[in-house]
Each structure stands twice: as C-alpha cells, then as structure tokens.
C-alpha cells in the first residue's frame, strides 16, 4: 500500500517539513493544492528561518522508494 506525504520545501536550507501523511491519494492532493495557494502568496513561513516556503510536494512512498512529485514552484 502506498503512503503519501505532503511536504513543504524550504529552498534556502534544503529542508522538507511533512504536513500530513495519508494512504489516500485524493486527500494528499487536496491538502497539497490548498497549501500551494498559501505558498504562492508567501503566507507559510518556515520555522527554521522564518522565510516563506518555496514549494509543495507530494512524496509517494511505495515499496520503500521515495518519489517526490513536484506540485508547483513559485517564481
């Protein structure tokens, strides 16, 4: 069974913060798309450096292989 993690990416520190972990792809996509609106508006700040996050990813963890799926990168 696949496990989907929704991650926020802090480019400056190359850190990922997991927001939710679920076995439901639709739930992961809904959360990622909702978060992406806030990331695009610079409204979600990294706890590490208090700077806005740079992107939202869905991590598909199936058979212990990590696969980061790019949602959107803000310019």
Regions found by a protein language model. Name each.
Residues 1, 14, 26, 51-53, ...:
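Compositionally biased, low-complexity intrinsically disordered regions
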Residues 1-18, 45-47:
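Short aromatic-glycine-(Arg/Gly/Cys) micro-motifs in beta-strand/loop hairpins
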Residues 9, 18-20, 52, 59:
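Generic ordered-secondary-structure signal
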Residues 14-30:
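A short, exposed loop/beta-hairpin motif centered on an aromatic-Gly-Thr core
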Residues 34-75:
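Short, mixed-charge low-complexity intrinsically disordered segments
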